[in-house]
Amino acid sequence: MTHIIIDGDACPVVDSIIDLTTETGIFVTIIRSFSHFSNQLYPPHVSTLYVDDGPDAVDYKIVQLSTKDDIVVTQDYGLASLLVDKVLIVMHHNGKIYNSKNIQQLLDKRYINAQIRKQGGRHKGPPPFTKQDQKVFEQSLLKVIHRIKELD
């Protein structure tokens, strides 16, 4: 059974994922560190798992829990690289799907930017997340959900 796991510490599309999976039979798990604790109540198909605040603790838990039938939503290229061959789909919150063809280029870009920062340089960060970005993500996730439902 398909399950969506969200790297929930900084994910701007949590509510969209919850709304789009309601009554689909797809369960959602939001994994967050305790520093992002929330009392927010979610529908029955959604669970929240909290982990320690250590570096990459959320990532390690996602790798541990994910299976071949899962969809993982993360903006972390390093985590995505560990999962592209392990899970069904790895998505960015911009709607793009990570795969073995594009992940190396993304990791290389991350490395180059880290080297620039290490030398005191700066590089342009990502633009602010917009309503249009959210709409693009929702359309991408809906396509994924429909594809999965066709396979079931």
Swiss-Prot record:
Domain of life: Bacteria
Coiled-coil annotated residue ranges, if any: none
PANTHER family: UPF0178 PROTEIN YAII
Family that this chain belongs to: Belongs to the UPF0178 family.
NCBIfam families associated with the record: PRK00124.1
Listed name of the protein: UPF0178 protein SaurJH9_0705
